[in-house]
From Swiss-Prot:
One of its GO terms (molecular function) is ATP-dependent diacylglycerol kinase activity. One of its GO terms (cellular component) is plasma membrane. The keyword Nuclease does not apply. Keywords: Cell membrane, Membrane, Transmembrane, Transmembrane helix. This is Uncharacterized protein MJ1137. It is found in: Cell membrane. The chain crosses the membrane at residues 4-24, 26-46, 68-88, 90-110, 135-155, 168-188.
Amino acid sequence: MREIYRQTIHLVFGVLIAFSVLIFKKQLIIPLIVSIVIGICLYFLCKRYYIPIVSDLLNLCKREKEDGKGAIYFAIGMLISLILIDDIKAVFFGILVFAVGDSLATIIGIRGKLKIKYFGKTVEGFLAFFISASLILYPFYGTYGIFVALISAFIEFVSKKIRIDDNLYLPFIVAFIINHQINICSLMNFI
């Protein structure tokens, strides 16, 4: 049950941040840097001291055997995307696909029956990510959106083997692939 709360918070904040990026564009870089610094400070303070509301929220958001760094990694991943990707729509979709897809993959994957032990994931979670990402991207990018959704779902599916928190790199990878759509489509047509 805790994981469902955690993923719901992840989903809501991710969607809000994605739309904030779309509205405020690159102006979010400085506030995001400040938020990351404050988040890191609060994280270390909460490890030593109880801070009302902040400690409770962090405890609600962290997994039982993890220390709750996911939100900080997510903010850093968004910052990397904002700095390195010029196309704001690509950054928006990178964050949105990750927030929705990752949350639904976890929520649905928890109850999944078809487990792939090697990856520590379920087929149902993979499909939840792929379908949600496809529904988000297809109206704007057509079949290329489905290609991006498939690549994104696969990367999320194997993320435990990568051993780097997917909050850090997946929003950037999705934004990068969308941003380089013309080059990738040309390469696919060439092959």
